[in-house]
């Protein structure tokens, strides 16, 4: 009897066709529609739209907020991951659940909670507002919201790396007289490069597209606190479909580039 070799893959047009039928209306067609409508008025019209002060501010502000958020969460997320992975203490599991809560909480609820804390009538805001300190409806509030929403992504990327790092490396560094800072700088930090890169890309990408918390804490003020997603929403509400599509296409393209680098890095890591 002749036995057919199986290389671990199955060839069939039916499962692939079913998958494509599902993906086309759910993902591929909506994404294609953005670029089709964005270019519907021609290249000149497209360039004119994205050259407007409001559109350029929204795109630039989104990138700045995403960058600042990524840097801050890079520090906070790495510190939290180190504490949760290297120290044993009562309530560690509970604390681990708490720091990951932003993933489960609707972003609009996040925005509401920040307003109730830092807003003009908030628990803290009512004391600092009279002296001229008001983080809400300002860039500071937007950054606070994005830090809250994206914090688990950096933590989730760095913590597994620290858990896999053998304690013997740190102990060896201590035995030759290295300080905690030197051990972190020369032993731990180099090992975290991959986790920081992945967490940074995920944080940046999610910050770029954040809407729910941002719309609550920013006031959606043009040329002040309006991010690209808020600008797109405002233009759709005003009936400026071409304008909204043009900025949406730029934002989508930027997200695709980030995703490409993430996939490429992950693939190289698996191969190595």
Predicted regions and their residues:
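Membrane-interfacial helix termini and adjacent extracytoplasmic/periplasmic loops
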Residues: 3-6, 43-51, 56, 91-92, ...
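Interhelical loop and adjacent transmembrane-helix boundary motif
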Residues: 7-12, 46, 53, 214-260
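Hydrophobic alpha-helical transmembrane segments of multipass integral membrane proteins
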Residues: 25, 60, 64-76, 80, ...
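Periplasmic/extracellular loop-to-transmembrane helix junction in inner-membrane transport proteins
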Residues: 6, 36-71, 86-87, 237-241
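C-terminal transmembrane helix and the adjacent membrane-cytosol boundary/short C-terminal tail
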Residues: 7-18, 26-29, 33-36, 91, ...
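Transmembrane alpha-helices
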Residues: 16-20, 101, 111, 148-150, ...
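Transmembrane-helix boundary motif in ABC transporter permease subunits
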Residues: 2-8, 44, 68-99, 112, ...
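Alpha-helical transmembrane segments of multi-pass integral membrane proteins
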Residues: 18-22, 32-33, 65-70, 81, ...
């Amino acid at each position: 009897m002749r036995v057919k070799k199986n290389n671990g893959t199955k060839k069939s047009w039916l499962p692939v066709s079913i998958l494509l039928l599902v993906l086309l209306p759910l993902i591929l067609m909506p994404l294609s529609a953005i670029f089709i409508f964005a270019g519907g008025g021609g290249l000149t019209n497209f360039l004119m739209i994205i050259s407007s002060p409001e559109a350029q501010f929204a795109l630039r502000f989104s990138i700045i907020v995403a960058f600042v958020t990524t840097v801050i969460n890079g520090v906070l997320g790495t510190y939290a991951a180190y504490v949760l992975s290297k120290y044993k203490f009562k309530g560690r599991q509970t604390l681990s659940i708490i720091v990951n809560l932003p993933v489960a909480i609707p972003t609009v609820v996040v925005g509401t909670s920040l307003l109730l804390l830092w807003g003009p009538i908030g628990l803290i805001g009512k004391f600092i507002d009279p002296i001229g300190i008001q983080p809400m409806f300002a860039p500071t509030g937007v950054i606070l919201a994005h830090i809250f929403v994206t914090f688990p992504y950096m933590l989730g990327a760095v913590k597994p790396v620290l858990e896999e790092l053998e304690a013997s490396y740190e102990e060896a560094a201590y035995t030759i007289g290295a300080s905690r800072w030197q051990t972190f700088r020369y032993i731990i930090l180099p090992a975290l490069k991959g986790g920081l890169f992945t967490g940074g890309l995920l944080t940046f990408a999610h910050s770029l597209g954040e809407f729910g918390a941002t719309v609550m804490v920013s006031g959606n003020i043009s040329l002040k606190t309006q991010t690209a997603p808020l600008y797109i929403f405002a233009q759709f509400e005003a009936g400026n479909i071409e304008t909204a599509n043009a900025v949406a296409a730029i934002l989508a393209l930027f997200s695709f580039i980030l995703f490409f680098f993430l996939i490429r890095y992950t693939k190289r890591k698996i191969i190595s």
